[in-house]
């Protein structure tokens, strides 16, 4: 095998091993996150709402406001807005 082929093989192996290590770290982190959600649930917190809050916190403020406005429009169109909001 030529040096170029050996070098390419070594590079490929290095990439694969790095990806495998990162995948293992990702699994460990996912397990840790799952444990935190379990802990929060055991203390009475709603994990669906926690996930929603985390999702909202990741959004840009303008993006969040735009999505809220679209959601409000859809809810109004379907008659799902509470009476207090309709009067406002």
Curated annotation (Swiss-Prot):
Pfam family name, one: GapR_DNA-bd
Parts of the chain that traverse the membrane: none
GO molecular function terms listed in the Swiss-Prot or TrEMBL record: DNA binding
Record InterPro entries: GapR-like, GapR-like_DNA-bd
Domain of life: Bacteria
Family, per entry: Belongs to the UPF0335 family.
Protein's recorded name: UPF0335 protein NGR_c28390
Organism encoding this protein: Sinorhizobium fredii (strain NBRC 101917 / NGR234)
Top-level taxonomy: Bacteria, Pseudomonadati, Pseudomonadota, Alphaproteobacteria, Hyphomicrobiales
């Amino acid at each position: 095998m030529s040096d170029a082929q050996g070098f390419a093989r070594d590079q490929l192996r290095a990439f694969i091993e790095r990806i495998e290590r990162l995948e293992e770290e990702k699994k460990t982190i996912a397990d840790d996150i799952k444990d935190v959600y379990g802990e929060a649930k055991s203390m009475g917190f709603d994990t669906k709402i926690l996930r929603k809050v985390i999702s909202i916190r990741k959004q840009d403020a303008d993006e969040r406001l735009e999505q809220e406005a679209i959601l409000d429009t859809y809810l109004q169109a379907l008659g799902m807005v509470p009476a207090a909001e309709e009067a406002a």
